[in-house]
UniProtKB/Swiss-Prot annotation:
GO terms for biological process: translation. The lineage of its organism: Bacteria, Pseudomonadati, Pseudomonadota, Alphaproteobacteria, Hyphomonadales. The keyword Ribonucleoprotein applies. This is Large ribosomal subunit protein uL30. GO terms for cellular component: cytosolic large ribosomal subunit. The keyword Ribosomal protein applies. The gene is rpmD. Part of the 50S ribosomal subunit. Residues 1-20 are annotated as: Disordered. It comes from Hyphomonas neptunium (strain ATCC 15444). One of its GO terms (molecular function) is structural constituent of ribosome.
Length: 61
């Protein structure tokens, strides 16, 4: 059984953000504006996206 995937793109800078938000972006595999990352659609990943929703956008589900 294959997991569903979710693709996220970084649209905001981590400069001046809290360390927790920087670490969350790194956990999502993002480090520069415009980069995308394809991740498995799990509750943990959804929670991470929700934590930094002002810095990322969901491109595809």
């Amino acid at each position: 059984m294959s997991q569903k995937k979710v693709t996220v793109r970084q649209v905001g800078s981590p400069i001046g953000r809290k360390p927790e938000q920087r670490q969350t972006l790194q956990g999502l595999g993002l480090n520069k504006i415009g980069r995308t990352s394809e991740l498995e659609d799990t509750p943990a990943v959804r929670g991470m996206i929700r934590k930094v929703s002002h810095l990322v956008e969901v491109v595809g589900e």
